[in-house]
Amino acid sequence: MLQPARRKYRKEQKGRNTGVATRGNSVAFGDFGLKCTDRGRLTARQIEAARRAISRHVKRGGRIWIRVFPDKPISTKPAEVRMGNGKGNPEYYVAEIQPGKIVFEIVGVPEELAREAFRLAAAKLPLRTTFVSRQIGA
C-alpha cells in the first residue's frame, strides 16, 4: 500500500478540505482518466483496491497511473480509552481529494475497456467519479 517513506512530523492537524483542484485536474499521462466530482478522502486501502480492480479488468494490456498519493496521516485513539492523554497514533494515510482531481489514468486499451475498468474501480471508492478522455491539442 502507498504511504510516505519518511515524514518530518508523525502527526498532522485535521485541516479543512476546501476549493476545487487546480492541479492534477486534466489527463496528463494516459488517454483516459477517472475524475472525482466529490470532495473527500481516499485511504491507501481504497486506492489499492481500485488499482487492483483496474489491473484485473485490463489484464496484461495498458499502463496505469495513480495520480494521487496518501500523504496525510489519520490518527485514532484506541477503543474504550478516556479522553485526554494526548493525540492518538497514526493509523492510516489518506489523500485529500477536491472536485476535479484525476485519480487514475490509463493508456493502451480501447475506450470501452477503459470505461468498464474505471466503473469497477469507482465502485471501490467513496466519492462520485466521472470518466474523462484526453483533450486533443491539450
Curated annotation (Swiss-Prot):
Highest taxon of source: Bacteria
InterPro entries tied to this protein: Ribosomal_uL16, Ribosomal_uL16_bact-type, Ribosomal_uL16_CS, Ribosomal_uL16_dom, Ribosomal_uL16_sf
Gene Ontology process terms (BP): translation
Naturally occurring in which organism (per UniProt): Paracidovorax citrulli (strain AAC00-1) (Acidovorax citrulli)
Keywords: Ribonucleoprotein, Ribosomal protein, RNA-binding, rRNA-binding, tRNA-binding
Lineage: Bacteria, Pseudomonadati, Pseudomonadota, Betaproteobacteria, Burkholderiales
Family: Belongs to the universal ribosomal protein uL16 family.
Function, in words: Binds 23S rRNA and is also seen to make contacts with the A and possibly P site tRNAs.
Pfam name, any one: Ribosomal_L16
GO cellular component, as recorded: cytosolic large ribosomal subunit
Compositional bias annotation for Basic residues: 1-13
Quaternary structure note: Part of the 50S ribosomal subunit.
Name of the protein: Large ribosomal subunit protein uL16
